[in-house]
């Protein structure tokens, strides 16, 4: 049985502090190849996600890793000891990236050939791909069959009398791949078991890794719905695995802020407790670059050396109560986001880019449409709201005042770190800044009606008994920077505004 990684380093553009080895203000090109090497050699991450989804990426990554850092990789076999896993674009969603979907799959045999020469034995350097925005088993079957029948299967195609493709390019290995569904929207998360079952019946894998999104559901539905949806999905994943007699190894996509998972070197133990049954945690860029290297390494090693805990399988009654909370919360949350969208979109374009991202079309959270509103990616969304004194974690919170005793039991029983996450986020509330928003320039103006809803959520923090520490130096500094940012925008000092946004991100140790 292969090793199931505990840690997966990713290329999320969420870091505030640029690493010293980066040539420009953002990581691109050969820097990302070096970064992958660093993930393994310095941070001891067991897996790196190589991201073709919505960003430029080097298709020669395996060649460059083996050629440039052979002394390391000769002792750490890529595909056996450590892993490089592609995240593909979804061709059903991103029409302009359909050929990139095909191109990425075509590089897998190339990686095999390079690794075979380097190691002197057959090595599947890359054999797993992540399929984003998975909404049906057909997505996974299509990806698997495309690889098997088009990428590997073309060898038998006859080009001329007696001349086959294999005579030109050689045999193609591996003959098959493993497809990891990345499930991101509510409808798909609550029927993740049927997606898995449909795929397993066709593909008949020996085991399955399943990727549960955490950040985008938070942006689409709110903090608390995102956590509950993850718990429902994990429960259903294990239930269907038990039913099918199949080992399933979940991945959770957690980021550094409470809204996106609160997974950072200072909060690792809490996150491990929050997600029992999860095998692999995403170690995003801010985790590595916005904390001292030794702190990040120690945290990653702690995860690597920990063992997955027993999963929690919800009863049908618990699941229905959780879904009721999710629906009620989402209605309130989305109404508030609609009113904040104008300000969020304006600020998002001022935040520093940290990767060579392209426009990404898909859910509410990917250039996303919602009630006629378009929003940026989740990282920029979170960063924008923090930067006007409204931590996104608080949006929709007043809904909790209406929960009954049974609903509270399900919420507190399944969101283990609810109170500490809210406490962490609430320290970044800036009341003076929020009250200023209705009188701001049009780019940042927020209606009085929306602000009234936000203030109700803030009031609910006290009514719910959330223990919020007195603001420390960092939080007071953040509030001051928020005021300076608003003043800069109001007076059209845009370069100053950008500088204050970056300074705030450094205080938070993440853009978003």
Curated annotation (Swiss-Prot):
What EC number(s) is this enzyme filed under?
4.1.1.31
**Which coenzyme or cofactor does it need?**
Mg(2+)
Name the source's superkingdom.
Archaea
Q: Name one GO biological process term.
A: oxaloacetate metabolic process
Q: What are the GO MF terms of this UniProt record?
A: magnesium ion binding; phosphoenolpyruvate carboxylase activity
User: SUPFAM superfamilies annotated for this entry?
Assistant: Phosphoenolpyruvate/pyruvate domain
Q: Does the keyword Signal apply?
A: no
Q: Does the keyword Lyase apply?
A: yes
Catalytically driven reaction(s): oxaloacetate + phosphate = phosphoenolpyruvate + hydrogencarbonate
Can you tell me which family this protein belongs to? Belongs to the PEPCase type 2 family.
Q: What does the UniProt record say this protein does? A: Catalyzes the irreversible beta-carboxylation of phosphoenolpyruvate (PEP) to form oxaloacetate (OAA), a four-carbon dicarboxylic acid source for the tricarboxylic acid cycle.
UniProt-listed HAMAP family: PEPcase_type2
Q: What is this protein called?
A: Phosphoenolpyruvate carboxylase
Q: What is the lineage of its organism?
A: Archaea, Thermoproteota, Thermoprotei, Thermoproteales, Thermoproteaceae
């Amino acid at each position: 049985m292969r090793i199931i990684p505990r840690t997966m380093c990713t290329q999320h553009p969420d870091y505030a502090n640029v690493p010293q080895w980066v040539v420009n203000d953002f990581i691109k090109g050969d820097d990302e190849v070096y970064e992958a090497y660093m993930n393994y050699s310095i941070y001891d991450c067991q897996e790196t996600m190589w991201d073709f989804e919505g960003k430029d990426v080097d298709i020669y990554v395996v060649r460059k890793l083996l050629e440039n850092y052979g002394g390391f990789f000769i002792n750490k076999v890529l595909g056996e000891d450590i892993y490089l896993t592609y995240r593909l674009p979804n061709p059903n969603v991103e029409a302009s990236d359909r050929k990139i979907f095909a191109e990425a799959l075509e590089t897998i045999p190339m990686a095999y050939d390079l690794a075979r020469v380097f190691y002197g034995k057959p090595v599947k350097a890359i054999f797993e791909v992540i399929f984003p925005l998975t909404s049906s088993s057909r997505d996974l079957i299509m990806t698997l069959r495309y690889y098997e029948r088009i990428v590997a299967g073309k060898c038998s195609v006859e080009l001329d009398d007696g001349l086959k493709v294999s005579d030109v390019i050689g045999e193609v290995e591996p003959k098959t791949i493993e497809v990891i569904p990345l499930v991101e929207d509510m409808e798909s998360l609550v029927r993740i078991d049927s997606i898995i079952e449909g795929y397993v019946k066709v593909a008949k894998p020996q085991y399955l890794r399943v990727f549960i999104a955490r950040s985008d559901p938070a942006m689409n539905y709110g903090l608390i719905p995102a956590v509950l949806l993850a718990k429902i999905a994990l429960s259903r994943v294990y239930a269907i695995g038990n039913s099918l007699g199949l080992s399933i190894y979940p991945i959770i996509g957690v980021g550094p802020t409470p809204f996106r998972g609160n997974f950072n070197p200072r909060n690792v133990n809490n996150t491990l407790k929050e997600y029992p049954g999860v095998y692999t945690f995403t170690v995003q860029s801010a985790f590595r670059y916005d904390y001292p290297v030794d702190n990040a390494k120690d945290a990653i090693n702690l995860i690597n050396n920990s063992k997955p805990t027993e999963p929690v399988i919800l009863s049908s009654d618990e699941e229905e109560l959780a879904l009721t909370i999710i629906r009620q919360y989402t209605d309130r949350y989305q109404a508030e986001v609609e009113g904040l969208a104008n300000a969020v979109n304006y600020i998002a374009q001022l935040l520093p880019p940290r990767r060579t991202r392209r426009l990404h079309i898909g859910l509410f959270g990917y250039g996303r449409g919602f009630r006629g509103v378009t929003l940026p990616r989740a990282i920029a969304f979170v960063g924008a709201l923090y930067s006007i004194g409204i931590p996104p974690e608080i949006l929709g919170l007043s809904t909790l005042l209406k929960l009954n005793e049974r609903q509270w039991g399900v919420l507190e029983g399944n969101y283990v770190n609810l109170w500490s996450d809210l406490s962490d986020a609430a320290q970044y509330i800036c009341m003076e800044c929020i009250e200023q928003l209705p009188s701001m320039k049009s780019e940042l103006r927020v209606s009085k009606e929306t602000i009234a809803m936000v203030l109700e959520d803030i009031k609910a923090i006290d009514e719910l008994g959330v223990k919020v520490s007195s603001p420390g130096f960092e939080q007071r500094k953040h509030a001051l920077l928020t005021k300076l940012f608003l003043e800069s925008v109001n007076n059209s000092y845009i370069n100053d505004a950008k500088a204050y946004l970056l300074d705030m991100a450094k205080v938070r140790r993440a853009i978003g």
